[in-house]
Amino acid sequence: EAVYASFGVSGVVDCDMDGNLLWQAAIGDGTAGFGSAASPVVYGDLVYVNASIESNTLFAFDKQSGRNVWKTESIMKSWTTPCIAEVPDGPPELILNQKNEIFAFDPVTGKKLWWCAGVEDYIVPVPVFHDGIVYCLGGRSNRAIAVKLGGRGDVTKTHKLWESTTGANVTSPVYHDGHLYWASDKAIGNCLRASDGEEVYRERLPTRSRIYSSIVRAGNKLYVTTRDQGIVVLAAKPE
């Protein structure tokens, strides 16, 4: 057992359960006004780190030794954490959303499998997937895009299912029962129908506080933590 953490320009660390440092790896020395935000992702024998801010690089480290197994560069304006998406009848894909493009990589080799035109602005929300489709939000223009997994090459015209002008700048969505839910930083609750991106509701929440946390579902409730006015609880249904 181990704990992996990313500290931006201070690098990535691996500690045992007693807090002893096992290894540390550098990921770059770049900084930005918002600081660093991406978390490490562990899958199989590798630890993935989106170091777009520190070095415009996506790294894959051996989780036992910290050795850099592979990396890909030119990752731009991406504060998001990658996700490992399960593909029906196919191998898993490592999904990373960045400014202008959504990428899928082979998690083991780092080979770029496909790419799709994305949000034309910086990206913060984490992609979510369900039943072979990945949903990517981001940008100050608040966009949302759905892409079918499993493609190869440029899939913009073949696998991009829909794009919506209802999205999120900072917060990540949650998928539940055919719908996507999230709360925007301006305290707006949002619900999209996942099948076609149709807006189901967009309503102001009962708080004046800003919201930068991602929504959490537990059972039939959605929990939204505000910046300074507690937690707002919503029903996990499209109304």
Model-derived regions, located:
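Noncatalytic, solvent-exposed loop/strand surfaces
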Residues: 1-239
